[in-house]
Amino acid sequence: MNDFWQHCSALLERELTPQQYVTWIKPLAPVAFDAAANTLSIAAPNRFKLDWVKSQFSGRISDLARDFWNAPIEVQFVLDPKAGQRSPAGATPLAPRAPLPSANPAPVGPGPACAPAVDAHAPAPAGMNAATAAAVAAAQAAQAAQANAAALNADEAADLDLPSLTAHEAAAGRRTWRPGAANANSEAADSMYERSKLNPVLTFDNFVTGKANQLARAAAIQVADNPGISYNPLFLYGGVGLGKTHLIHAIGNQLLLDKPGARIRYIHAEQYVSDVVKAYQRKAFDDFKRYYHSLDLLLIDDIQFFSGKSRTQEEFFYAFEALVANKAQVIITSDTYPKEISGIDDRLISRFDSGLTVAIEPPELEMRVAILMRKAQSEGVSLSEDVAFFVAKHLRSNVRELEGALRKILAYSKFHGREITIELTKEALKDLLTVQNRQISVENIQKTVADFYNIKVADMYSKKRPANIARPRQIAMYLAKELTQKSLPEIGELFGGRDHTTVLHAVRKIADERGKDAQLNHELHVLEQTLKG
């Protein structure tokens, strides 16, 4: 059994990336082999890794086992029985955090769930002076008030989408799950993901990387490795369906692997707004603040939904300040550059700018092809590069659109019982391709760019060469090449009969400068989003 596992591990180490091998294969261990039943049991340190390895690697491990023993082997994945007694390899438990002060909890009436009352007028114990006794009584009263408030937390938390707190951990500003406890059994592991609201499927391993998102991915990995130290806050912005949500879930999932006791919460901005409203209605801001201020990692998606909501912004500002002061990590996403989000308080904008702001651009052609090929592979379908290239060339906006198109192609192929070819793809995507071709034209690009740079549309066709005209013209040529199916000669003809070499020079010049000039990159991003509607 051990000989097989050494053989299997060595092969998988060569087949996988170093990150995949260390994250998923190295923590596994063979625990039993039944020669009579031809079953091999492999232990995983926690439920998350067990489920992922079972879904992604069980087939390959079964094949290797069959080859090794020259017989069909049933590979079973089980939780390591010792997982609850130790932290996973490489995991670093989080240091305890200092208790957070209570935000003046309201008095709570007596009842079976309340802490015993403290008599401030009771005689001081022997040997204790009056001043010391008063201080002790005050501390006991504060502790009792916190315990009383915590007794109601379960009901309030259910309404506010907050995990319930025990009296002890509410007083300490901490949630009920502890470092290492998440690995004790599958129920605890499932609870860990339920509390954090993370999607365990969204990881760095299955995030397709290209020029459009490589900086964002690098920053995300750096933050996952050094939360609260590198880039705090990390602000990711870009259009719909470009992978912002995938990346922030990947950060959370990686941190849970490295530090299973981490207090993590993913939340969409709309849910945060809803929680603020409910906390206000129920006078439950104590619980709200205690929960959010005690996190180790807060992932907040689509913060543009805070626009115009002053009370939400105020509460988030206080949470942000508390988290950063405690060296907790904050990660934010938006569809817009921070300074261009309307209706957001200047204090928040300045906090967003204090960390690292990274744009995620629409995927380039090669990346779109890679996304389609990987998605098809995950669906168990063989997709030719010709078909992937055809789809990627015609659909340019975002990953969700590509995945939706692929699902449509697969369904069309299955329904008609035909092989996936370019002809079938054209039939399956007929309506979508028609809409795409109708939406963006060279004329529309010229008008949009002219309006953006405050020049006349006629300047696009003219022979004028001042920088304030030549530059927008080159940008329009670049966008025409990127966003339409026109050839270089056709684009040149639409720009006043220019030669195709002039268009090629403009396209190469803008493409090269885009990678070096952050301002130009931002302007192009805005124009692309405007043209795509």
UniProtKB/Swiss-Prot annotation:
GO terms for biological process: DNA replication initiation; regulation of DNA replication. One of its GO terms (molecular function) is ATP binding. The keyword Cytoplasm applies. Residues 414-533 are annotated as: Domain IV, binds dsDNA. ATP binds at residues 241, 243-245. Residues 197-413 are annotated as: Domain III, AAA+ region. Keywords: ATP-binding, Cytoplasm, DNA replication, DNA-binding, Lipid-binding, Nucleotide-binding. Gene3D superfamilies: 1.10.1750.10, 1.10.8.60, 3.30.300.180, P-loop containing nucleotide triphosphate hydrolases (3.40.50.300). Residues 96-110 have a biased composition (Pro residues). Residues 72-196 are annotated as: Domain II. Domain I is involved in oligomerization and binding regulators, domain II is flexibile and of varying length in different bacteria, domain III forms the AAA+ region, while domain IV binds dsDNA. Oligomerizes as a right-handed, spiral filament on DNA at oriC. Plays an essential role in the initiation and regulation of chromosomal replication. ATP-DnaA binds to the origin of replication (oriC) to initiate formation of the DNA replication initiation complex once per cell cycle. Binds the DnaA box (a 9 base pair repeat at the origin) and separates the double-stranded (ds)DNA. Forms a right-handed helical filament on oriC DNA; dsDNA binds to the exterior of the filament while single-stranded (ss)DNA is stabiized in the filament's interior. PANTHER family: CHROMOSOMAL REPLICATION INITIATOR PROTEIN DNAA. This is Chromosomal replication initiator protein DnaA.
